[in-house]
């Protein structure tokens, strides 16, 4: 560790932060506004561990794992392009730190199955992803693997979307149960819900790679326009002359994220009086999205020219993550009598 990095670490005193993303496809506006912008700010004040959750990708995509390696490389490029700094944050791949799996296994010995079955996303994703067989332990147990991901680094805070809060609460319960059986090893982390955590997709549902409703960070200006100009709006506006209400319009949620107060006021007035159509309403929002993505995409192109950059970042991140993970697992094995 360099002197500059050590000084930086010492100045970031607000506790350890842990979060990850599954490499199941291109990152999109939901990731950017729901996680990545927040991560970039958090790395200034906290010791951050951000990981590519490739084992988590197998919980739903176990039958077709071929894209994980390339998706991992693309994800690291996106992270660097939006501003994550590998000299400040630990960026690593989950499967390269096997202690994640070991801690998950040990947790599985003490956690009741009903605790996993009651996690809301367990039923929700089964309903949303009906074309896949999700009757596996891996899918049932992925919130417990998340608990291992978090507790392995003794995180104080976990930045999540609102729908992931039950996973953090499960992690707190796991920590309490382990500590009750074996002594005080793990802290109880808190979930951080960030503003704009739930970004709507083009169909009005939460933006998700799985739903096919996402605007990718790598989409060029034409692709962004094509996708967002067709985004669903207030269903009452069947005709151009029908008035609507922005509070019932999924597209307006992107206005709230991207547009100025004056722009939102003008759009709101035009919608409620039917003085503008939905396509005209979306134009200013689309332009704002395009303007934000352009410099990110330029930085990404520059990074792509640096041969081996993703491998270098992941190798250094693995080294730093493994050092912490090994220390924690030494404590866990000792507490459980497994030394």
Residue ranges and their predicted role:
Residues 76, 83, 111-115, 155, ...:
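A generic secondary-structure signal for well-formed alpha-helical elements
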Residues 2-148, 297, 301:
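N-terminal Rossmann-like or analogous alpha/beta NTP/dinucleotide-binding catalytic cores
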Residues 23, 158-159, 213:
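A generic structural motif
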Residues 29-31, 166, 172-339:
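Conserved nucleotide- and phosphate/pyrophosphate-binding catalytic cores
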Residues 113-117, 152-159, 259-267, 297:
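Short helix-capping/linker segments at secondary-structure and domain boundaries
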Residues 102-104, 118-127, 131-181, 185-203, ...:
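Classical nucleotidyltransferase
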């Amino acid at each position: 560790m360099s002197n500059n990095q050590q000084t930086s670490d010492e100045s970031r005193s607000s506790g350890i932060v842990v979060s990850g993303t599954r490499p199941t496809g291109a990152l999109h506006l939901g990731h950017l506004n729901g996680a990545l912008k927040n991560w970039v700010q958090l790395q200034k004040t906290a010791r951050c561990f951000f990981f590519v959750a490739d084992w988590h990708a197998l919980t739903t995509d176990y039958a077709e794992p071929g894209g994980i390696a390339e998706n991992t490389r693309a994800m690291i490029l996106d992270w660097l392009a939006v501003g994550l700094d590998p000299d400040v944050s630990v960026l690593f791949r989950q499967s390269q730190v096997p202690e994640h799996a070991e801690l998950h296994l040990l947790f599985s010995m003490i956690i009741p199955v009903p605790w996993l079955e009651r996690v809301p996303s367990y039923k929700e994703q089964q309903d949303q992803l009906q074309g896949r067989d999700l009757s596996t332990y891996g899918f049932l147990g992925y919130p417990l693997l998340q608990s291992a991901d978090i507790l392995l680094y003794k995180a104080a805070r976990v930045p999540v979307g609102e729908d992931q809060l039950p996973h953090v609460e499960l992690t707190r319960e796991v920590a309490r149960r382990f500590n009750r059986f074996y002594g005080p090893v793990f802290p109880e982390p808190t979930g951080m819900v960030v503003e704009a955590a739930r970004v709507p997709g083009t169909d009005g549902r939460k933006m998700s790679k799985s739903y096919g409703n996402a605007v990718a960070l790598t989409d060029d200006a034409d692709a962004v326009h094509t996708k967002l100009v067709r985004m669903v709006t207030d269903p009452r506006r069947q005709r151009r002359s029908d008035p609507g209400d922005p509070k019932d319009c999924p597209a307006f949620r992107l206005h709230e994220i991207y547009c100025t107060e004056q722009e939102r006021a003008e759009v709101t007035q035009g919608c409620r009086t039917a003085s503008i159509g939905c396509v005209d309403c979306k134009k200013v929002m689309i332009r704002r999205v395009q303007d934000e993505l352009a410099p990110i995409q330029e930085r990404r192109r520059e990074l792509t020219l640096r041969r081996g950059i993703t491998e270098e970042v992941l190798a250094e991140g693995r080294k730093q993550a493994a050092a912490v993970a090994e220390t924690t697992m030494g404590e866990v094995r000792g507490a459980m009598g497994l030394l």
